[in-house]
Amino acid sequence: MDLQDILLHDETIFKDVRVFNSDYLPEEFKLRQSQMEEMAFSLRPALHGGKPSNNILLGPPATGKTTAVKKLFEMAQLDCEDDIICVYVNCQLHSTKFGIFSQIYKKIFGHNPPETGVPFARIYNKIMNELYDTDKALIVALDDINHLFHGNIISQIFYDILRAHESYEGVRTGIFAVLSDVEFRFILDKNVGSIFNAAEINFKPYTYEETYNILKERVNLGFYPNVISNDLLEEITTYTFENGDLRLGIDLLRISGNNAEVRASRRIEYGDVEKAFKVSKSVSLRYILNSLSDKEKTLLRFITRMDKKNITSGQLYEEYNRENKIGYATYNRQINKLEFLRLIDTTYTGSGKKGNSRYINLRFDSKQIQENLPQQKRRSL
């Protein structure tokens, strides 16, 4: 069946539109093989009666952290279901202690706990007794863990998971913390940080070649043959690589395909991609901005208001500190976070103390950031 017959039959250029979904899990995930091997070694002690090792999965958004941990958990549950229980929790959706332990409860018992009328202690007790009775280890992946920083709820959750053995002898638990915050350990209470003792597994941004190969694979799986040219795919790859967010490229493919279908076209043309650029970039930027803390948003908003090129970190600190009293160490951590998320670029000037002064420049247009930053809530009088 040629492309024309396929279109006449299905009225679509998509072979499988699901491969462009944000929650799609590829059958193979070779690009993060080394990171998955590190995580697998952390699970091995649990298969022999020991305690799983804790990990921090650290990297900018859209670098494969979520996919890697989900694929590993999928494999572990198939091969080692008698020894280990793997629970993935999206903390953006479940950001309370009850919500997170409800997900653990659901994984173990196959249904949610009652939402009312049952104290948390009873749910917690049932989970831990089940682990004790079955002699299975529990490993919990907490994704987008920055959503637990408010009110330091993260320390409560870590404490309840990692110190379970103190009340339930022999219970074995571990945590995979998935995040992009370089200063994660500053959040934890000391008594929790001392028992977390996690190894860092780093997910660096994809190279241009890796980005192209991932997008090419999605094209092959998601579109019928010859729907998009290599030239357009390379243009999307370049745009994706420069913006440092793989989700942007996957969205561009999906939106470009939709644009072509609106025109009743069998192929994606340049105009379809150009139109998709305007939609997709704002969506990706908004996702990154929503991951910032309120104080990081305040600093970024201040930088956009200044809208100066090549301002030094020292000059920026002096001006920012006049309006927002902040210690230099805290300010420096926030700047590093903004750079880590590729919202700003920094380059060393060669001057300043020990030559460590940096120029700071926005990677995005000031107006675009301001339009996508969530509005600050006004304090009620």
Label every PLM stretch briefly.
Residues 74-84, 110-112:
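Post-Walker A helix-loop "phosphate-sensing" segment adjacent to the P-loop in P-loop NTPases
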Residues 1-53, 379-381:
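A short, basic N-terminal segment
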Residues 49-74, 93:
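Walker A/P-loop nucleotide-binding motif
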Residues 259-284:
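Conserved C-terminal helix/linker of AAA+ ATPases
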Residues 307-381:
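Terminal-proximal interaction/regulatory segments of ATP-powered molecular machines
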Residues 7-16, 21, 93-214, 224-240, ...:
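Mid-core helix/loop region of P-loop NTP-binding domains shared across ATPases and GTPases
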Residues 241-246, 254-268, 304-308, 324, ...:
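AAA+ ATPase "lid" subdomain C-terminal helix
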Residues 54-56, 79-93:
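Conserved catalytic segments around the Walker B and adjacent sensor/switch elements
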